[in-house]
């Protein structure tokens, strides 16, 4: 029994060590439009040696539409060039937002559970309707385990605020803003009810 606990502790520490480091991922263009090819360039840190031992690496992009509750996973094989891993992808036409992780199928770099994110833009250069809202929802900490981002309600409120500034008629974003503000204590129960009635 003690041996099992000891092994579990060691494995837990090892897992935490793997998760405490993150490489860097650059996505270009910075503000991609619908149908535009997105270039990925990943640089691993020395601490990612265990992940690199089982190459080749691939990127998994979880693409969100404004309507669907769950994302679509898109896998991209990465090719090693001059110490960097590169690849390219075109996201589905109805995608508004995506988060990315890089790995070998067993071990993934999730950027310390923050992932890397891509907001799709329209022809005017603005985030597509729903992009900031999906970025906010990703921070609720309620996505399926393979793409669960660390929760951050302060950042979620910032993204919801951006969404309602760009798209003041997005009722779902307004509803979520009130709901999160109430759960963080920024709004009282009565204040939240009053704002719900205004929608």
What are these regions (language model features)?
Residues 8-18:
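Bacterial N-terminal signal peptides
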Residues 1-6:
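Positively charged n-region of N-terminal signal peptides that target proteins for export
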Residues 21-199:
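Glycan-association/targeting regions that enable binding to alpha-glucans and other polysaccharides
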């Amino acid at each position: 029994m003690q041996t099992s606990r000891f092994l579990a502790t060691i494995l837990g520490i090892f897992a935490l060590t793997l998760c405490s480091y993150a490489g860097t991922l650059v996505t270009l263009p910075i503000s991609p439009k619908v149908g535009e090819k997105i270039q990925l360039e990943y640089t691993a840190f020395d601490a990612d040696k265990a992940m690199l031992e089982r190459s080749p690496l691939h990127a998994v992009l979880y693409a969100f539409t404004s309507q669907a509750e769950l994302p679509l996973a898109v896998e991209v094989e990465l090719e090693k060039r001059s110490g960097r891993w590169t690849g390219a992808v075109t996201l589905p036409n109805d995608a508004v937002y995506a988060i990315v992780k890089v790995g070998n199928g067993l071990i993934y770099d999730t950027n310390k559970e923050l992932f890397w994110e891509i907001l799709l833009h329209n022809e005017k250069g603005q985030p597509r309707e729903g992009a900031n809202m999906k970025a906010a929802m990703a921070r609720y900490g309620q996505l399926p385990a393979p793409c669960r981002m660390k929760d951050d309600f302060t950042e979620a409120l910032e993204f919801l605020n951006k969404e309602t500034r760009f798209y003041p008629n997005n009722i779902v974003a307004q509803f979520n803003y009130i709901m999160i503000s109430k759960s963080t204590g920024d709004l009282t129960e009565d204040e939240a009810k009053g704002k719900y009635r205004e929608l």
